[in-house]
Swiss-Prot record:
This is SPbeta prophage-derived uncharacterized protein YorH.
């Protein structure tokens, strides 16, 4: 049993021998993977924003908006990026100077539905054997017809 170290992500203690070392810090395997994924998503979002607005780095306002969307709305970094892609690429809107990424709260849910639908379509297209075909068996009963008597025309 090795020395106890503190995971910088979840801040719980763990054994140094079972930890994943990264830049003189020690992580749980799950925490490291989560942290690395968040880091990659942040880089992808910032890269997309820079490409979209033609910047070398995002403005302070944009970084503040990203932080606000994460803390107040609970949005994920990848979700913010996909919402921006949906608004600017799928809906063909043009970015305006000075607006930042303030459109995200207005299109986030719509973009989420769009990408979930796209994923379901891709999944069903990949494996046609997975389609569930429901068989319906209809039994047509020969109904008992009422026998009508002959109609006397003179009575009408």
């Amino acid at each position: 049993m090795g020395r106890q170290v503190k995971c910088p992500y979840c801040e719980t203690k763990l054994d140094k021998d079972s930890a994943i070392p990264y830049k003189k810090r020690y992580y749980h395997e799950k925490c490291f993977n989560t942290w690395k994924q968040e880091s990659d998503h942040r880089k992808e979002l910032i890269q997309y924003i820079c490409n979209l607005y033609g910047l070398t780095s995002p403005t302070g306002m944009m970084l503040k908006q990203i932080k606000e969307f994460q803390e107040e709305y609970g949005y994920k970094l990848k979700g913010i990026e996909l919402a921006l892609r949906y608004f600017y690429e799928t809906l063909d809107n043009q970015p305006r100077e000075g607006d930042g990424i303030g459109i995200v709260p207005f299109v986030y849910d719509e973009a989420k539905r769009h990408y979930i639908r796209q994923k379901a379509i891709r999944k069903s297209a990949e494996d046609p054997k997975n389609h569930k075909r429901e068989e319906i068996t209809l039994v047509i009963k020969k109904g008992m017809r009422k026998k009508r008597g002959l109609v006397d025309i003179s009575m009408l």
